[in-house]
Amino acid sequence: MASVQRKSWCALTIRLLGRTEIRRLAKELEFRPRKSLGQNFVHDANTVRRVVSTSGVSRSDHVLEVGPGLGPLTLALLDRGAHVTAVEIDPVLAERLPHTVAEHSHSEIQRLTVLNRDVLTLRRDELAEPPTAVVANLPYNVAVPALLHLLAEFPSIRTVTVMVQAEVAERLAAEPGGKEYGVPSVKVRFFGRVRRCGMVSPTVFWPIPRVYSGLVRIDRYPTSPWPTDPAFRRQVFELVDIAFGQRRKTCRNAFVDWAGSGNESADRLLAASIDPARRGETLSIDDFVRLLQRSADRGGTDREGTSPPTAGQGAPAR
């Protein structure tokens, strides 16, 4: 692990925040990290370089950073020439961030926007320009909801590079049938491909968390294989929730209420080339999408009484 952290990832010209300076800033602000907000700040320059290098952001990118905290990752992103919109829920940290950037490189401040907001309520009309990338050290307690919200709300986002709790990283990248495979694994693949990019030691954070972190990158599909409108996505996600709410049941039994009867459930599954005896935890995102679309072909309806769209009939992406 240590050898990974020492690797040189990319050259930065801005002086980054180290552990001593982060502690000094916290003391200056009379600030104590709150566990309820998942506030753990990365202070290791090599880790910051690694995250930025993995993201691949450049001058052409508008980066959405979630939970910038005291600004170590923000500085590195600005150093790459990107425009950065930093979304920080803590008002004290949000107010201090522009001053920190100005102190380290005054010329970069023009490319920084800070929003004192909860990322889960962020809407696209609040940003002057659509973001092309997300790069963040995500608070553990909101990692999955934040990822799904941002991918749905901002279709302009092409890549997501985040540090999350190692367990969350494993779940996001898990394959069908594995013990870590679950709702997050499937839903994030509705939007794009997921890959793990290594582990991150707890010692690079202040305060030191009790668990390892994982670095994850998500690349949105260049062209979505299925409709991306909110109604279609909601129906697919409903099937995912049903399947994993009863993950040890066979698919036939898990989808009885949704289909209306056991026989209809089996027929819809067979129409989608899914063995009714399979368990929900073995289904891929392709399986869930196909199940919904084949149900529509058979005349199945959603709870509002309208047939789910088949491929190519989706509304503009949200």
Curated annotation (Swiss-Prot):
Domain of life (superkingdom): Bacteria
- Give the range the annotation lists for the signal sequence: none
Q: Where in the cell is it found?
A: Cytoplasm
Residues binding S-adenosyl-L-methionine: 40, 42, 67, 88, 118, 137
Query: From the UniProt record, which GO molecular function terms apply?
Result: 16S rRNA (adenine(1518)-N(6)/adenine(1519)-N(6))-dimethyltransferase activity; RNA binding
| Record-listed E.C. numbers | 2.1.1.182
Instruction: Return the annotated region ranges for Disordered.
Output: 295-318
For this record, the Gene Ontology CC terms, alphabetical, are: cytosol
Locate the compositionally biased regions of type Basic and acidic residues: 295-305
Reactions catalysed, as given in the entry: adenosine(1518)/adenosine(1519) in 16S rRNA + 4 S-adenosyl-L-methionine = N(6)-dimethyladenosine(1518)/N(6)-dimethyladenosine(1519) in 16S rRNA + 4 S-adenosyl-L-homocysteine + 4 H(+)
- S-adenosyl-L-methionine listed as a keyword: yes
Q: Which UniProt keywords apply?
A: Cytoplasm, Methyltransferase, RNA-binding, rRNA processing, S-adenosyl-L-methionine, Transferase
Xref: CDD domains? AdoMet_MTases
SUPFAM superfamilies listed in its UniProt record: S-adenosyl-L-methionine-dependent methyltransferases
Q: Which family does it belong to?
A: Belongs to the class I-like SAM-binding methyltransferase superfamily. rRNA adenine N(6)-methyltransferase family. RsmA subfamily.
Q: What is this protein called?
A: Ribosomal RNA small subunit methyltransferase A
Phylogenetic lineage: Bacteria, Bacillati, Actinomycetota, Actinomycetes, Mycobacteriales
